From Swiss-Prot:
Gene name linked to the record: Zbtb44
Matching PROSITE patterns: BTB, ZINC_FINGER_C2H2_1, ZINC_FINGER_C2H2_2
Bias (Polar residues) ranges: 352-361
Species assigned in the record: Rattus norvegicus (Rat)
Region (Disordered): 241-265, 295-324, 336-368
Protein name in the entry: Zinc finger and BTB domain-containing protein 44
UniProt cross-references to Gene3D superfamilies, sorted A to Z: Classic Zinc Finger (3.30.160.60), Potassium Channel Kv1.1, Chain A (3.30.710.10)
Annotated Low complexity bias: 304-318
Keywords tagged on the record: DNA-binding, Isopeptide bond, Metal-binding, Nucleus, Phosphoprotein, Repeat, Transcription, Transcription regulation, Ubl conjugation, Zinc, Zinc-finger
Modified residues (Phosphothreonine): T200
Length: 453
């Protein structure tokens, strides 16, 4: 006679275990590690932290008794971002709001809690509530959204993330496809293979049709190597063959091409990029160039491109001198909703490729405008020489964006970079309806209408 076997499976056992572990932590029982964040002390259990975070598992697993430290300092994490993650480790519930989501996202990325970081990123892109009285509701949006105090967000894989948010305004749905997100910019590359010429005309009527070339070439096949918007943070694109001698001899002036000509050049560039050979690292120029197909959802922070008067009129890349600086905690404020957007040419103090032709008269003005358009400069450790660059993946850049993988040296830079992925552009032009993420970018855009009129 066979032995009967009965298996009991309790769905509430894990929650009960976490609840009891949280009670032990709150009472201070069996806590074997102390976390210090911004001079605040948090008691916890090593086994819980190591099970939730790859960062803590790397720190704690494999240590000998002599090397075992009971106090662990987290220098790159804020208290506002750490407390929700600690509560999540013991309760499996993440409580975020519009004031702490950036801190939580930065802390989760640093602590390598990528599932939490992905949830925060998706929530910020799809469920953040913005209270912008000056912005007009877009056409095609559902006006019958209901107010909710607890928002359950469904991720891409179909799982429901228990994300609670205190909602004080009507939820605003971000459309999946908008005209502004379909626009791609064809960056002008000054290479020997494509000697592009551009004039400094800023009031040309062709500026208004600068994006028409994308509609003509959007259905053309693209090489697989160019299908994803990869950036090359240090050094130029490996697929570009620069020649310093030819660039020094041939002083080029930038000339604004028409819509059809710009589309043809972009198509020719895309088709011939795959045939170019790869250069060794030693022969690269000390410039940073990024040529790719971009949208508002596929934006990276570290973008370098040629800066000239004509291009500033094409994509409104300049900023207004003397404008008020953007504060770090302005997640609710629209002025910081998308810092680093390529549409507005924000860079992180990186070197740019300056033209050596008749636009030299505008070089000083471009440099002056470029220096004021980003409130946070690239931080270099005091031990690093001013002429050296920190490693793109080294300890100088400990903060990584979970959405696009860009790394940063300061937590403030990552916090502001994450605002890009929200896709919110609250400032709209009254003349043409184009939207911007910053007020001063809208001011510069209005100057173009004044010049044309």
């Amino acid at each position: 006679m066979g032995v009967k076997t009965f298996t009991h499976s309790s769905s509430s056992h894990s929650q009960e275990m976490l609840g009891k572990l949280n009670m032990l932590r709150n009472d201070g029982h069996f806590c074997d590690i102390t976390i210090r964040v911004q001079d605040r002390i948090f008691r916890a259990h090593k086994v819980v932290l190591a099970a939730c975070s790859d960062f803590f598992r790397t720190k704690l697993v494999g240590q000998t008794e002599d090397e075992n430290k009971n106090v662990l300092d987290l220098h790159h994490v804020t208290v506002t971002g750490f407390i929700p993650l600690l509560e999540y480790a013991y309760t499996a519930t993440l409580s975020i709001n519009t004031e702490n989501i950036i801190d939580v996202l930065a802390a989760a990325s640093y602590m390598q809690m990528f599932s939490v970081a992905s949830t925060c990123s998706e929530f910020m892109k799809s469920s953040i509530l913005w209270n912008t009285p000056n912005s007009q509701p877009e056409k095609g949006l559902d006006a019958g959204q209901e107010n909710s105090s607890n928002c359950n967000f469904t991720s891409r894989d179909g799982s429901i993330s228990p994300v609670s948010s205190e909602c004080s305004a009507v939820e605003r749905t971000i459309p999946v496809c908008r005209e502004s997100r379909r626009k791609r910019k064809s960056y002008i590359v000054m290479s020997p293979e494509s000697p592009v010429k551009c004039s400094t005309q800023t009031n040309s009527p062709q500026v208004l049709n600068s994006s028409a070339s994308y509609a003509e070439n959007r259905n053309q096949p693209v090489d697989s190597s160019l299908a994803f918007p990869w950036t090359f943070p240090f050094g130029i694109d490996r697929r570009i063959q620069p020649e310093k001698a030819k660039q020094a001899e041939n002083t080029r002036t930038l000339e604004l091409p028409g819509p059809s000509e710009a589309g043809r050049r972009m198509a020719d560039y895309v088709t011939c990029e795959s045939t170019k050979t790869t250069l060794p690292l030693g022969t690269e120029e000390d410039v940073r160039v990024k040529v790719e197909r971009l949208s508002d959802e596929e934006v990276h922070e570290e973008v370098s491109q040629p800066v000239s008067a004509s291009q500033s009129s094409l994509s409104d890349q300049q900023t207004v001198p003397g404008s008020e600086p953007v504060q770090e905690d302005l997640l609710i404020s629209p002025q910081s909703s998308s810092i680093g957007s390529v549409d507005e040419g924000v860079t992180e103090g990186l070197p740019t490729l300056q033209s050596t032709s008749s636009t030299n008269a505008h070089a000083d003005e471009d440099d002056r405008l470029e220096n004021v358009q980003y409130p946070y400069q690239l931080y270099i450790a005091p031990s690093t020489s001013s002429t050296e660059r920190p490693s793109p993946n080294g300890p100088d850049r400990p903060f990584q964006c979970p959405t696009c993988g860009v790394r940063f040296t300061r937590i403030q830079n990552l916090k502001q970079h994450m605002l890009i992925h929200s896709g919110i552009k609250p400032f709209q032009c009254d003349c043409c309806g184009k939207k911007f993420t910053r007020a001063y970018s809208l001011k510069m855009h209005r100057l173009k209408h004044e010049v044309i009129s």
